[in-house]
């Protein structure tokens, strides 16, 4: 009997210890004792943190007087930093009053069928409530904790997790709402559930279900029937625009950190996409003097940054130096929702930036093929030049901008995106979302069908074959699908050589009509003969249309009836406080097939006079340019037979003594020498380049190639096929060969270098 009693007592003790182990030791979600201690230590020798603390304390003191629910995060942080019970009592009072509400639902959302009981406003309230409850937990009585917990479950936890995750009440799927709303609603509801589980053991199972489901959000592969995009690109990043990508990722990471903090010693599992996010956020940013800018493709603004996600990644153990570099570029307060030093999360989670590198160790170009973005830059230094191209999905936050582009130069988006505004405003659906707000080609005044905002584009756009050889870069945009109601070909090539971006449009439509090129510029626009100069401070570019026609030389366009004429179009500014002008270059002729070639000359200074000289040249089945600048000559050829007009015959042309089937190629050589002796080539979609019975390049399948030879070293950049057997002419055996920045063995025979590649 005695042994039985002892056994029962031991069992009860073990059970009690197990139950205690399952309980959360508040505070432990995000404002942890460890974080508080670390920031106190850093404040002793970091004046910026001291200044930020003063701002936070001031905000908290104002909230203390007003009993401001929306400043629960400030009150919580100040209480945990000072241990002044006055702040904790205010938190308790605010929460006790908050749970008296009948509902935190939104009237418009509740009117939907089925009713949406939760939305972003509720998600934010959930976060604030969780932080406050976690901070003030130990000053509440057990009855107060229970009352608040039950109220918050009714108002937020059950509606959020019930709508987005739990059976049998779930109404959303990843296919219908699997973007930033999903992580915000379910993860903030999950953080709140984490904070309440001591009083409400039943929510623990909900939390664990969310934890198990979160990787599924990152892995969502899209679908065919509803044309939903794959959420995360293989190279990192999310298609929704930087603004919403950062927001959705941030919300997910907040929950993951809170889960880890409340589950010490437990393995959270791997989410492989996280490791690629620092590169993504950096590749779509533009470092400059002043605040960091980022791509504003879709529903984002150029001042939006992703320091919040970067900080949370760093806290999760992704100790990539790129994160430190990125955060160091962000200007305090540069956008509405940031994690800045004088805001609680930024105060606690901004890492020590003293070891941030001057520039990131990243490639200067990046292709995000899954969602159709590409960036190319000449340097990671501030105020460099960056070209960004978009041709991917259209739907929701992703605009009708297939084949559009942005040019940042000398600190300014000198060729810009039209922007966006608040969605209920008619200007959003009538202008900002539509093709007219982007740098694209219209046919008979039409771009992508307007209904794609809601229905999406069944046929998406694509980007292909990015090559980066330093002073020569290339990417191909295929925007045919989104405009296939009018176009059978809508290809746009971007060939960046030295200080000129050449934009080549290959266009064919189902019927005869008129083409126009749209230009959204950010600066003083001045037409000078056949050129347009755009200048903003130290940033200046020349826009020079070369094919199909030059820009009419003067305002007397009737004297140049075949040349491009221009139209000024007024459109709303992003802030909706006024209007701005964008420009359309019209081709007067009515045709159904055209090649467009426009040079964007990147000026070193607004007053630079030594610009490239460009001579238009044509021959049998080809058009092109001869470019002379600073002692170098570049011949650019565009093959008129290689645009799909031939079915089974190959597209051979013979320009200036060359023989090739390439869609386009360029050869560069010092002025005063012969093209035949050139060592630098660009070949676009070609299988051979020959001259005087010599083979300069050969491949059984057509490839995209940049070739540079210098100091007995041959560098090649090649794309186009998974298996490649190619040969390249070199007069002498090179001592070193690199292909796509990787050294390979030198296999050389009779002036031919053999290259074998397998993906």
Give short role names for the model-derived ranges.
Residues 1-22:
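Bacterial Sec-dependent N-terminal signal peptides
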Residues 19-21, 421-759:
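CBM-like, beta-strand-rich accessory domains located in the C-terminal region of large
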Residues 26-44, 48-279:
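Aromatic-lined, polymer-binding surfaces characteristic
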Residues 118, 122, 182, 245-248, ...:
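Active-site-proximal structural scaffolding
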Residues 172, 196, 239, 243-414, ...:
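Carbohydrate-active enzyme catalytic cores, enriched for enzymes
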Residues 415-420:
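Catalytic Cys-His active-site segments of thiol-dependent hydrolases/isopeptidases
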